[in-house]
Amino acid sequence: MTKVYITDTLSKSKVPLETLEPGVVKMYVCGPTVYNYIHIGNARPMVVFDALRRFLEFVGYRVIMVQNFTDIDDKIINEAKEWNVDWKTVADTFIAEYFHDAQLLGVRAANYHPRTTDFVKDIVEAIETMIKKDFAYPAENGDVYFSVRKLRDYGKLSGKNLDDLRAGARVDVNELKKDPLDFVLWKSAKPGEPTWDSPWCNGRPGWHIECSVMSQKLLGDMFDIHGGGEDLIFPHHEDEIAQSEALTGKPPAKYWMHNGMIIVRGDKMSKSLGNTFMVREAVRRYTKDGVKLFLLSKHYRSPMEFSDEILQDNMRAAQRVHNALNRFTEKYPYPLVPKIDEEMENFIDRFVEALSDDFNTPVALSILFDTVKELNKSMDEGNDERALKMYHLVKRIYGPVLGVFDSEIQKQQQVNSEQLDQLIQGIINLRNEYRKNKQFEIADKLRDALLNAKIKLLDTPEGTKYEIND
């Protein structure tokens, strides 16, 4: 089996992937808190770990993947109050919307998508075990806290020192805690909030405990890879390790992989900062493959700058690939499978080598683009036999592994998307001219005409942008 190397956040080094069970990779990836539509920042781990899963399957592993939904949280409760609906309606709605957006991106469903609320009984039992082992304690009001100082090596994932954390901690007004660093395992109920029974009080689980319990129940006491965004390293993943070690005496995962953040004008893309760009809007404007090329164009551990210009570049790159594939299938609508020769093996070996080296998708994509050039060159030279080989590499090997270029429908979608963008940009430029000449009435009519077509103009310091609403 191909030797695969990954960067492990815990050991802070690139290490060979040596699975606990030969030939099987068990992987847990933290999913979203379902209180809104997912944005491009949420989509990066979805696309990255879906592609990693595809690659591991390609080189011969059986992959068992779990990705959870946090379906009870303050944000969900607040959203429900704002819209005067039940909290479960909010969670159910945005779980369905998540799968809709995942389908738009061509991200496969995990083997399991557990919800926190389906594991409350197991969570309560886990907390009881930690209390018995003296790793947790109930407070006077029924809250239950994890005693961080019971673990001497707390902070090993993030590289944080307990004493430094203590010194840098803000004054904690929560007098129920024995130590300001202790984190909540069980929250006592507030009026009007959903609650579950427990030995301590009616309440609900804390955030960190859910992943420890769900991963253990579905993948066992220890599994191979735990993935997620680097913003989860501390405190979420650090606390997961603490809980799992308290419960089982060992960390939940052998390896930890974390993707970098999407950056918008210097800040992390997040709903709290109001700088998000929703997945469905991105796919509509830049196409599925344009968005996925963008998300795979940088090494997964590196931060990525988000901008309209960068997405446009990736959309055009995707269009060039589709043009080459469609050029071949217009001549040969039903391409056969070629015999793998030495040249093809060399291409495949380079592609696998790139992804085996800490999942280096930028290098893998450069090999894909080189192959597309060779496809066009072979077509130009009338060498259809070689063109078939290059087509096969792009369409049937590289594409399925990375999760791109898997739909013939994409051709028309991409053409339409680019043409629509050019049309709207032309109208925006015309409107700007009218505004410059103080012909505001005509400028407003152009804006209103677009709005009637569900295209909303947004005048920003960086210029006029637009969004398309359903």
From Swiss-Prot:
Q: Which GO terms describe its cellular component?
A: cytosol
Query: Which CDD domains is this protein grouped with?
Result: CysRS_core
Predominant location category: cytoplasm
Keyword Aminoacyl-tRNA synthetase appears in the UniProt entry: yes
| Pfam families assigned | DALR_2 (PF09190), tRNA-synt_1e (PF01406)
**Motif 'HIGH' region per UniProt: ranges:** 32-42
- Keywords on record: Aminoacyl-tRNA synthetase, ATP-binding, Cytoplasm, Ligase, Metal-binding, Nucleotide-binding, Protein biosynthesis, Zinc
> What are the subcellular locations of this protein?
Cytoplasm
- Residues holding ATP: K271
Q: Name one GO biological process term.
A: cysteinyl-tRNA aminoacylation
User: Cofactor stoichiometry and binding?
Assistant: Binds 1 zinc ion per subunit.
Q: HAMAP family attached here?
A: Cys_tRNA_synth (MF_00041)
Its family? Belongs to the class-I aminoacyl-tRNA synthetase family.
Which protein, by its recorded name, is this? Answer: Cysteine--tRNA ligase
